[in-house]
Amino acid sequence: MSVWNKGFTKETHPALRKTSETMRRKRIDNFRDWRDGMKRRGLIKSSYPSLAKNGDLAELLGIVLGDGHVHKHDRCDSLRIVGDAQKMGFVVRSAQLVYSIFGKHPKVTKRKSSNGVNITFYEKNIAKRLNIPTGARAQYEYCLPAWIEKNRSNTIRFLRGLYEAEGSLSHSPATYTHKFIFSNTNPHLLELVARLVRGLGFTVSNSANKIQVSRKDEVQKLSNLIEFRHYES
């Protein structure tokens, strides 16, 4: 016996969409009893407290600001970080940070059409607890929390997250040049990163969509300080 609505969703079938809209308008929740039972069994959270303010959270915030996205759904939020299949150290570390902070493993999937790897996590109030808005952030002016800015260790972890997501380290033997670059199209985020790196004692130059540390001794020192691309085997 075939199922008439197999393969359809409320977005792709008019009858399903109408039913969904009617249930939403009448505030009918088909899954309430199931959800309440799962909460009683401890399989679904019933509360979503503030996140522990520590180095792991500081680093994850940097990753999300650099290469992450928070999306608002009807009943929850989703956090997605995009990594590279050729840089699995970043993927594994990002997934571990999500688990460390939220206590739940994210879904890690390879994109079929590219080397991209999605690290995806669903839960209520992600945006509120991270204090990062949902949607696009091209011009978003992030207000760095005091628990990061006034703590050197947390500042370093925050910068590590940003550089792991959007940083590049290069050395040209031909020209004897060294470059440690952070790239981003958000001018407010670039200025924040430049200010924090200068505050740690490094010389920074600014240009379109990137900031750069280029003194040989400083490049290696900054790379070592934030443990750039250093992953546990």
Regions found by a protein language model. Give the residues of each.
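Internal intein/HINT superfamily modules and their associated LAGLIDADG
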Residues: M1-S233
